[in-house]
Amino acid sequence: MGKVVEISINKFSYADKIILENVNFTVEKGEAIVIAGLSGSGKTTLIRLLNGLIPQVYEGKLTGEIKILGKSTGEYKAGELAKYIGNVFQNPDDQFFSNEVENEIALVGENTGLERSVLLERVNSAMEQLDIVSLKGRKLRELSGGQKQKVAIASTLVYDSDIIILDEPTANLDFTSIEDMRRVLKKLKGQGKTIIIAEHRLFYLKDIIDRLIFLKAGHLENIFLPEDLNESIRKENMLRCFDYSELTSEAAEAGEEVLVRVNDLSVKNKSYKLDDLAEFSLAGGECMAVIGENGIGKTTMAKELMGLLPIKRGEVSYAISDRERLRYTAASLQNCRNMFFYETVEKELIPREKEADREYLDKVKKYLIHLELWDKRTMNPHDLSGGEKQRLALLISMLKKSKLVILDEPTAGLDYKRMSLVSSIIEEKAKEVPVILITHDLELLFKVCNTAYLMSEKGHRKICVTGNESEIIRFFNSKDKQ
């Protein structure tokens, strides 16, 4: 078949910090591999070395060589690798330069000088291959996360890239979009494309990949075949689960005393015109998952509960006005960058009136150490990594005295270890006040949630998690939510 990627890294470092060392492997034409490992293991750096972002965008010192299609990456001119490698980032918005779908898909072809007639033909072909013809004429900002990822992949097909590199492409996707991604990747592999994916979520890849490259602390720790990926290997290497059907509830039962009531709350939004009313109660010790497809009203409901949106209809028991709801709820938002207002992590967590409160300061220190943020405490929050920002946003909500906690996708893009750290903090908080958890992360749900609120076009309902694991998994997987 022939080698299309040859990696021989003796050492790669940023300044004096070694990031990768003794990483050597090859990728055959038409092969699909996943690069896995805990955050900080070197996955993103390796991806940047492969697609040429290092050294063209990011500086660093490489001892060794990386070859793409038999040619050292250092021999390619700036931008030339884009002819052969298609890139799909974790957040597709980071790679978009156009406002409309067709213009974005055509961009690589325009930049590489394709004739207009050929370019138009390839744009149409790419959209047909990915079943996104219906998106013609749409604005990118109007699309869902899954649709945006398909547009990003379509742009790689316009120049007929031999190699497609994806960096955590499902971190922000719901189950329906992940299944779409799985079908797209399987189709591309069937066309002979070489696929390299850096990913934490593995359940959708097991029947696609040929090998799993496992990095640990910058070293190539192991290479696994799909048949090697059993539960023992998963636990030993702290990998995300391979099969959701094997998950069972681990959460303790909620208490009996009702602390929060939500009555006849309207969650109608621009996407869904149906005005199905939300109604539920929350007891002490309860962590309730809120699940449903994107656009169904989960975030609208959360914003109403926390006072960011006015309640159009209905009432809640813990507050009357928008201002009171803001005061009595603690929240961690999906776009947590908007939650930071101070110049250091410490100042985000320690209000002026708490600076002399030794008990509070000890609690902050305990949480910072537990969430692996202690050595980041003097940094600007905006300089943290994505996962570190998520954990800081979670910690802000955990420390606030409140009557209700609302968490929106607190583990998106987190590895198994950090997901487990986050879950233990959520469990601890749920013992104090009820927690509402909006999530597409089934592993987290089964670890911490004792109830689930299922939202769909056919109505909303609340169920216990224990004993209903199969029903919840079916609900996640179903496009037509029951």
Located regions from the model:
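Hydrophobic anchor residue at the start of the ABC signature
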Residues: I153-A154, L394
